[in-house]
């Protein structure tokens, strides 16, 4: 997912930065959202495919039945969250162009906290085992997209 989101995001850094430099915050936000929805669509489509056929995708990377089974479990949980990653990554780069990095950094911290801490709680406290860790990662990825998106709105990108 990183190459896809990076391709969109790196262009957003320049496009948003140019609009911000011209003092056109409306265009900066609009450009950020168009790019973010493009990344969401691309990553979400890939994630849906992975989530719907996890065994087939896992089999591309290993012939070991146990490895494929565990990888397929992970992909079935995490695949549907790929769209959130695309959204978050694209808006991260757009925020960099706007010079507004507080929300994307907070989003990254939320992602880590949910993936590691939330995954541990789900796995151990709620007894979900390995699936709890995978769900924690999916929740972290989703939160990354949502929290980053919260930072790209008029109240946060109003101008200087």
What positions do the PLM features span?
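Small-residue-rich hydrophobic transmembrane alpha-helices
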Residues: 1-54, 85-104
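Transmembrane helix-loop junction
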Residues: 18, 59-60, 73, 97, ...
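Hydrophobic alpha-helical transmembrane segments of multipass integral membrane proteins
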Residues: 41-44, 80-83, 87, 113, ...
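Short membrane-interface helical motifs at transmembrane helix boundaries
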Residues: 45-72
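Alpha-helical transmembrane segments of multi-pass membrane proteins
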Residues: 65-91, 116-117
């Amino acid at each position: 997912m990183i190459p896809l989101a990076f391709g969109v995001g790196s262009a957003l850094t320049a496009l948003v930065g140019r609009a911000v430099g011209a003092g056109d915050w409306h265009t900066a936000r609009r450009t950020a959202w168009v790019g973010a929805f493009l990344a969401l669509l691309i990553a979400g489509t890939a994630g849906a495919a992975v989530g719907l056929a996890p065994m087939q995708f896992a089999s591309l990377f290993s012939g070991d039945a146990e490895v494929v089974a565990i990888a397929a479990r992970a992909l079935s949980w995490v695949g549907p969250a790929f769209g959130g990653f695309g959204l978050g990554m694209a808006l991260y780069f757009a925020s960099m162009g706007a010079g507004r990095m507080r929300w994307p950094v907070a989003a990254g911290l939320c992602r880590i906290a949910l993936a590691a801490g939330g995954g541990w709680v789900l796995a151990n406290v709620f007894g979900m085992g390995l699936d709890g860790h995978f769900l924690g990662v999916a929740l972290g990825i989703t939160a990354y997209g949502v929290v980053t998106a919260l930072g790209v709105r008029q109240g946060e990108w109003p101008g200087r």
